[in-house]
Amino acid sequence: MKLTTVTNVSVDGVTQGHRRIDAGPRHETDAPDEDGSGTFERFGWAPPLLDDAASTFISQTFQRADAFLFGRRTYEIFAGSWGAGMDPGNPVGEALNTRPKYVASTTLTDPRWADTTVLSGDVAGAIGELRAKPGGELQVWGSGTLIRWLLDRRLVDEIVLLTYPVVVGQGTRLFPATGPDLGLDLVDLLSTPKGLTIQTYRTTGRPQYEAATA
């Protein structure tokens, strides 16, 4: 399966707190799990900028997934929002409740959401086995710490960025100040009436650099 990450990000690269629901209790922070809120205060910067075009893209992206991969904190947020009792006619809820879900976590032992498998121990090996399966798409939503962990191990095939026209000015960013370098090919670019840009990139290994002059 192709491993695709889908991330809501501000112009200054912040991923943290894009919805108010993210202002929950702090959970484990050890990679490959998701980070907590810390001292971040500027929650909910994304919903005012969502429009019908962005919502349609999000729904269609969820529907094309064959399976989902989460860090623990994002998994628990999604389970609380989209788990039992969700309107079966909701396309996002339908996708999440009918596809297999995988959680990269060293502490989660009793997942309550149906069709969930916890990946512990050799997480990279388990994800590699999922990627080796023919066809399909394994999607990672949110889960910023997990995404950085995956990028560091070059386990990501495509990166989708929903970039919101806002500078948040604080918070955890998708790409750290120091991390792996990565070449990208732009395979799709969309814009919405409220100014979101949605970029889809295919990873190409390490980037090329200008040769040093004599």
Q: Where are these predicted regions, by residue range?
A:
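Conserved catalytic/dimer-interface elements of ABC ATPase nucleotide-binding domains
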Residues: 160
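Portal/gating segments that form or line small-molecule/metal binding sites
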Residues: 1-155, 165-214
